[in-house]
Amino acid sequence: MSQSGSRLFTSESVTEGHPDKICDAISDSILDALLTDDPRARVAVETLVTTGQVHVAGEVTTTAYADIPKIVRDTVLEIGYDSSAKGFDGNSCGVNVAIGAQSPEIAQGVDHSHEVRTGELSDDEIDRQGAGDQGLMFGFATTDTPELMPLPIALAHRLSRRLTEVRKSGVLPYLRPDGKTQVTIEYDGDKAVRLDTVVISTQHAADIDLDNLLTPDLREKVLGSVLAEIDMPELDVSDIRLLVNPTGKFVLGGPMGDAGLTGRKIIVDTYGGMARHGGGAFSGKDPSKVDRSAAYAMRWVAKNAVAAGLADRIEVQVAYAIGKAAPVGLFVETFGTEKTDPARIQQAITETFDLRPGAIIRDLDLLRPIYAQTAAYGHFGRTDIDLPWESIDRAEKLRAAAGL
């Protein structure tokens, strides 16, 4: 149902130097390296970082070779951790690797689906690949922004990206890699009307004046720059509360300040809390894992549905059983914004999209090294990189199937 009245909604983002995002970047960089030489590699790589140490563990079955310690160090250095004074140093950190093979019991369900083993197989080769796990995945889209994302998470990601840009370009050379942003938007019903609060917490060099240097710089070079880019004249930005490093100084950051883990920023990775989440993380997983590939597919479905004018706001859920090709469930929620019968929308989605894992991989061309670029700043609604699940190539077909 659509809601009426004024309310505040908040989403957060983090920079690539956040400890959890270091881990996501390492896991996805290893995945990309393996997919480059072996597109059918089965990969599930988890990373942990702490003071001076990187631990990589997981299951991999592949014909490819990846120099994991080198990938780890290169990734850490590219993020910007090149000195212990910054909380981490890719040149000297310890790297521990503990990688085994994928369980043969899991592999048999992916390689030979339930449909194959029970004689339900059609002539369609796509039926041969089963889901890599059971689970439920959600996709979401809304008319909040041109990229059909919720405005709070879209702005939070833009602020985080800009925070990294001004650090790496030398515009604000005293910034360090670790950082977080948070955006609170006032909604009138379902319409974003005012930017209420922005929080920016960023690691910085010692002896930086918070009030006289950091805050004015971030207001102009980060917040001001992002606001100048957005084309939303109806959004009131006249009285923004900006909170910079509300705890005071932020010198001790990165893995020295907090341990990091792969897959611990799943709301940042998706819709900033405005949509439900099935619980599965993305990074370090090859596309046979429906946690990743089906979540991408559901964003594709939702974005095409909104682009087709079927609803102003839509959430779609798909569910799988491990080893089975066909989804066990599909659910569509339009929050009262639908332009036709929701049952008709669901039927149109079923007719337009093949949500078997093999079909998703085929249609979105997922057996490619495209994943490291998604490790920070969100997997959805990206305007800075080209991602196949952001295409609206099925919108017209979907609209026709819905009878509009």
From Swiss-Prot:
Q: Which cofactor does it need?
A: Mg(2+); K(+)
As to how many cofactors bind and how, the note says:
Binds 2 divalent ions per subunit. Binds 1 potassium ion per subunit.
> According to the lineage, what is the superkingdom?
Bacteria
Please tell me where Mg(2+) binds in this chain: 20
Record: residues binding K(+): 46
Q: How does it assemble?
A: Homotetramer; dimer of dimers.
The record ties this protein, via Pfam families, to: S-AdoMet_synt_C, S-AdoMet_synt_M, S-AdoMet_synt_N
Q: Which PANTHER family match?
A: S-ADENOSYLMETHIONINE SYNTHETASE
Under which pathway is this protein filed?
Amino-acid biosynthesis; S-adenosyl-L-methionine biosynthesis; S-adenosyl-L-methionine from L-methionine: step 1/1
Name used for this protein in its record: S-adenosylmethionine synthase
Residues the entry annotates as binding L-methionine = 59, 102, 258, 289
> Which family does the record claim for this protein?
Belongs to the AdoMet synthase family.
Q: SUPFAM superfamilies of this UniProt entry? A: S-adenosylmethionine synthetase (SSF55973)
Primary role: Catalyzes the formation of S-adenosylmethionine (AdoMet) from methionine and ATP. The overall synthetic reaction is composed of two sequential steps, AdoMet formation and the subsequent tripolyphosphate hydrolysis which occurs prior to release of AdoMet from the enzyme.
